[in-house]
């Protein structure tokens, strides 16, 4: 635990997740909000800014008013010391941000352990759960949940799955085994297989898509790029995916997907490219998708909401963040409310998209030179009894 403003126990990345950290409600897994010390070091481009200007410019999830109060109350410190709002930071200084951390909820399904060997553990990852700590997620991750519920630590992810993708995940239990897997991946010795539920009747026979994948981080999605005949090489990275229809009911098809390369959103964008997008993929189903740059990222929407909070007395350290929302406030009985928190009294952080669902894309198999790991098919892959027999045969 970290030393911070008096009277509060502050967690750091060194504090492991525990089983009692989770709250289950309405089919979702929440993390009980907790006090946390975020530590960063002043980058060269930050040097010369005041502490308040720095956080206002770089961390837009909270309004400037919050950061002014945070400095005054010791929630923002430099080199473990309280400073004033006009303090100018210098390169490499340590900055601690003590805050009440709310993680986004994930779908409430269990993480099923498939195989637990001496050097390897494989699991079935539910959709919506990130593999490892990133962004707002720390405890609500596959790594965090496995540590809290099964005591599995350390774990080294052999591969990644996007947050909304479900299915097989392989972890090495030690650095040597992780390095062995890494070498096999670099030598292109692994075969990956996914299933997807797509719109329409997918063609019979193997379909191979060779189209560069260009990921636009600003828009939050990829595009498939091919040569348009003008002699210019297409942008993006070379990508190849092989597809095979497993079954169809005339409305949807279940398709086996074998990515030869591993680009961001490769399977999703290649399926869209050939006219058979994943049937519930909001990002690639429509050409009218509202990109991040036009509708605002989740963090920008959070900023807008936070800035609309009732203004507080500038001399008070206790009134900021008493946001009144429609979310069920029975959470008050399950965690402490922080008067400076811009998310309280809600369990989820401001701006969380409560409507997201599992993507119909699921990893079913990874095969190496002398090993193979598999994961059961999801319920959505069984279109009828015929498809159930095919998939289970």
UniProtKB/Swiss-Prot annotation:
It comes from the Eukaryota. One of its GO terms (molecular function) is pseudouridine synthase activity. Residues 49-118 form the S4 RNA-binding domain. The active site is at residue 162. Keywords: Isomerase, RNA-binding. One of its GO terms (biological process) is enzyme-directed rRNA pseudouridine synthesis. Belongs to the pseudouridine synthase RluA family. This is RNA pseudouridine synthase 7.
